[in-house]
Amino acid sequence: MQIILLEKLDNLGNKGDILFVKSGYARNFLIPYGKAIFATKDNIKFEINKKEELERELIKKISIAKTKCEKIKNIKSIVIPAQVGIEGKLFGSVGSRDIAKKLSELSNIKIKKHEIYFLNGALKHVGQHKVIFKPHHSVSITVEINIVSQDKDK
């Protein structure tokens, strides 16, 4: 019996795959539990159109991510002022939210905090640090962060 998988199954395949399985397995397990549907002509056409649409969306997301990286590549380094204690250690830390906010201000594009990845955890010391800006899992760029002491006069 021919079926279309609605979700990824370890022993069978990925979502959207068209497979032949034993009819009892399909009727008694896959279809009643919502893991597959019968592979009729209409369902096959629908799945093919759905896959094409998902591929177009993926290409669009990747192109948007690449344009974001190009805009950020023009920024040499980002200076973030922070309150500093003894021996250059920060009060608190500079997190992904702070870096995303500063990058958004400098590049005029919206950057979400989950697009920032740290190489060694949150930044807790004054100095030069590197973080990864990753708007899509296949597109990333390394960004220089310079944390400086905030003036106490303000």
Swiss-Prot record:
Record's function text: Binds to the 23S rRNA.
Family: Belongs to the bacterial ribosomal protein bL9 family.
Disulfide bonds: none
Keywords, sorted A to Z: Ribonucleoprotein, Ribosomal protein, RNA-binding, rRNA-binding
Cellular component GO terms held in the UniProt record: ribonucleoprotein complex; ribosome
The organism's place on the tree of life at top rank: Bacteria
GO molecular function, one term: rRNA binding
One GO-annotated biological process of the protein: translation
Keyword Electron transport tagged: no
Protein name: Large ribosomal subunit protein bL9
NCBIfam families listed in its UniProt record: L9
Pfam families given in the database record: Ribosomal_L9_C, Ribosomal_L9_N
Annotated source species: Buchnera aphidicola subsp. Baizongia pistaciae (strain Bp)
